[in-house]
């Protein structure tokens, strides 16, 4: 466990709203360096301004988490600015409603891209950095958190694509 979060680095996807934004606020209060990631520039800009006003060191990036090249660049930027992150919150998520047989291939690709590949990219890119940091310093601690959903326990109607991912 991490005992003192001051000066530690957190990477938060979906940081422009919801859980991601709330976790960024908590991180700022705890004195963390924040890497804010969102696909919506206006939400990212607002979150960045709020965290900087709270005194946090912020690296903000507009990134489509489903895009491997964008995520690879994000990981390189994080490594260069802060080193290995102590916390990675793979939080970005989307859902397409409607009848599953009426959803388009684009709908499926969008939801699978963000909700599945976003997590895959976050884990595959940041885990090696974190393991290297822990090998260099046995006292170093880090955590990866992947957002889950109540939909894994209680299925909502007309959310077929989203629900197909929850039960993988």
Feature map (PLM): residue ranges:
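Residue(s) in the substrate-gating loop at a strand-loop-helix junction
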Residues: 149
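Substrate-binding pocket helix/loop in short-chain dehydrogenase/reductase
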Residues: 99-100, 104-109
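Canonical Rossmann dinucleotide-binding motif of NAD(H)/NADP(H)-dependent dehydrogenases/reductases
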Residues: 2-34
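Conserved small/polar residues in nucleotide/adenosyl-binding loops
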Residues: 167-168
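The beta1-alpha1 cofactor-binding region of Rossmann-like NAD(H)/NADP(H)-dependent oxidoreductases
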Residues: 41-42, 62-73, 105
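Active-site loop immediately N-terminal to the catalytic Tyr-X3-Lys motif
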Residues: 101, 154-160
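A short, exposed helix-loop element centered on a Lys and neighboring polar residues
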Residues: 123-124
């Amino acid at each position: 466990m991490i005992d003192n979060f001051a000066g530690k680095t957190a990477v938060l996807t979906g940081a422009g709203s919801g859980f991601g934004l709330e976790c960024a606020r908590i991180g700022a209060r705890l004195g963390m360096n924040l890497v804010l990631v969102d696909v919506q520039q206006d939400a990212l800009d607002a979150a960045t301004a709020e965290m900087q006003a709270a005194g946090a060191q912020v690296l903000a990036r507009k990134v489509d988490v489903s895009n491997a090249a964008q995520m690879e660049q994000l990981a390189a930027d994080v490594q260069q600015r802060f080193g290995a992150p102590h916390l990675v919150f793979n939080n970005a998520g989307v859902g397409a409603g409607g009848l599953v047989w009426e959803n388009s291939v684009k709908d499926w690709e969008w939801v699978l891209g963000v909700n599945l590949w976003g997590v895959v990219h976050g884990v595959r890119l940041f885990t090696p950095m974190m393991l290297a940091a822990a090998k260099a310093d046995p006292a170093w601690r880090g955590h990866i958190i992947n957002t889950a959903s109540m939909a894994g326990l209680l299925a909502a109607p007309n959310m077929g694509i989203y629900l197909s991912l929850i039960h993988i």
